[in-house]
Amino acid sequence: FLLVVSRLYDPLQGALQNLAAVISTRTNIARMNEILDHPIQQGSDRLSNQGYDIVFDHVGFAYNTGETVLKDVSFTAKQGEVTALVGPSGGGKTTVSRLAARFWDINRGKITVGGMDVSRIDPETLLSLYSIVFQDVTLFDNTILENIRIGNKDATDEQVIAAAKLANVDEFAKKLPDGWHTNIGENGCELSGGERQRISIARAFLKNAPIILLDEATASLDVENETLIQTALSRLIADKTVLVIAHRMRTVAGADKIVVLSDGTVAEEGSPKDLEEKNGVYAHMVKLQTESQNWKLA
């Protein structure tokens, strides 16, 4: 019996591994079909030089699953200002930031950039206006230099390094065995979370687009990395139209405008000072996070 079992073990193990591979392949095929079946976005208009204000005008949006995410969202993110999106989880912050760059087309209302409807702008032209710094950084199995150069494929090594220094990438690059030419592994597996974020910010510096979409990415970082990234971001956003997803209220205290999203609508908007005095949703969130921080310190 034991002899039979020992002879069956390897074939059974191989069969189970193959079954797992087939299941994984089916999932991947389904994802690929979803991408291939997605309608190609159209748009032929070129941007006129009317600035880079982003305006949401009674925007409604639902995913293909039928899940309504935004019901009636209206606000303006002005050029030269930082507009922070805050609110409870599931309120629509991430969706709003991605709709601004036309990741998806909306169901109703209108989104404009510089007065032009984004649904009528050539998609490639529209995306050229945005530098995107989100929490999920996509890096490639290549050198630090080449990963940053994605921000501007025509940039020289000197330009790439200059952008990297603005993002404080040089602080860790100089410690690596091959410096700027160090291979960082698949998806940056050789780097820490803070180092990955700094490469993402360096790309944005290199691209130098007039609009910044920023997902606050310092929540899980240590104090040193958080300080370095906040310093880099303060340089990056100067004189830009900035739309930032905020998870911690203390990081947006210096924003020009706060837009509070809740249940797919704008619950309130205004300066941080005005909203704190209003004693509404934003003030309540600030109070809760302050109390939570004090409790941790205690």
Regions found by a protein language model. Give the residues of each.
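Membrane-water interface of transmembrane alpha-helices in multipass transporters/channels
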Residues: 1-2
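Pre-NBD coupling/linker segments of ABC/ABC-like ATPases
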Residues: 36-49, 275
